[in-house]
A protein has these predicted regions:
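Bacterial N-terminal signal peptides
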Residues: 8-16
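Active-site- and interface-proximal helix/loop "cap" or "latch" segments in soluble metabolic
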Residues: 24-150, 157-266
């Protein structure tokens, strides 16, 4: 009797494992984003497409706290340069993406203690950020189909500077037609740190009860992700809003640059 019970438990565990695996490989688009910006200013993202139960496409990219376009765009344009013999970041990232498609499982990557790998030819960059996010993405629910026609990273910078010398920027990530991430920032006409970084350092201070600019801005970003359309952001005549808890900063400029960025996605 004990042997039969043990056998039944084993069968149940096997089928349970198969079931979990099947759920993890449901067809669809999967997304994950890092929790915070790194010391170099990057926050990484992973986008994985599953079709027929298999990973058919993987994208690794990064957004930044500098008010600039995504990492792949900057690397391809020569703005973000490593001068590595193996190629620039976007070239190496593509090899890592291809390896995930080959392996079909991010846990199968061989990652060293320094977050790099010797197992992928032509790759000298750290890859742990991607492998961790790929695991996280595949463990989450697929991204629901959204209203936008194109996926990708959409950036826009205001052509004008405000009275404080800042020009607002928006970098929006769209997956399966859905906004999954929004990044609001501003660059100064004199150069130097972005508004977000200045706020973090305490160089740009508001002394607001709701928090400094870098604290309030993510609340506005989260609202756009929730609403899915910058046109739905409620803005008063003074450029502020009463519709987002903990936000006293003006948001009109974000509404404008986000709408401009997303024109290319519609």
């Amino acid at each position: 009797m004990k042997k039969i019970t043990a056998a039944l438990i084993l069968i149940a565990l096997v089928f349970g494992a198969v079931s979990v695996g099947a759920q993890a490989r449901r067809d669809g688009f999967y997304f994950a984003e890092g929790k915070e910006f790194s010391r170099s200013g990057w926050k990484y993202q992973a986008v994985i497409e599953v079709k027929g139960g298999k990973i058919v496409k993987a994208e690794w990219n990064g957004i930044n706290n500098l008010g600039q376009p995504d990492k792949k765009t900057q690397a391809a344009a020569g703005v973000y340069r490593m001068n590595a013999p193996q190629g620039e970041w976007h070239v190496q990232a593509a090899r890592v993406e291809a390896e995930l498609i080959r392996l079909q499982d991010p846990t199968k990557f061989v990652v060293k203690a320094d977050a790099k790998t010797d197992a992928i030819s032509g790759v000298s960059i750290t890859i742990k950020e991607f492998t961790d996010l790929a695991v996280q993405a595949l463990a989450s629910a697929p991204v629901a189909k959204g209203m936008y026609k194109k996926d990708g990273w959409f950036y826009f910078k205001s052509p004008t500077f405000d009275n404080s010398g800042f020009a607002s920027t928006a970098l929006i990530t769209v997956v399966n037609g859905t906004i999954v991430s929004a990044n609001w920032n501003a660059v100064h006409r004199a150069g130097g740190d972005s508004k977000f970084v200045r706020a973090v350092k305490g160089a740009y201070k508001m002394n607001a009860k709701q928090g400094e600019w870098h604290v309030q801005a993510p609340r506005v970003e989260a609202e756009l992700v929730k609403l899915q359309d910058p046109a739905k952001l409620s803005v008063k005549s003074d450029g502020k809003t009463d519709a987002i808890s903990g936000v006293s900063i003006t948001i009109a400029e974000f509404k404008t640059v986000a709408a401009e960025a997303l024109k290319a996605a519609r």
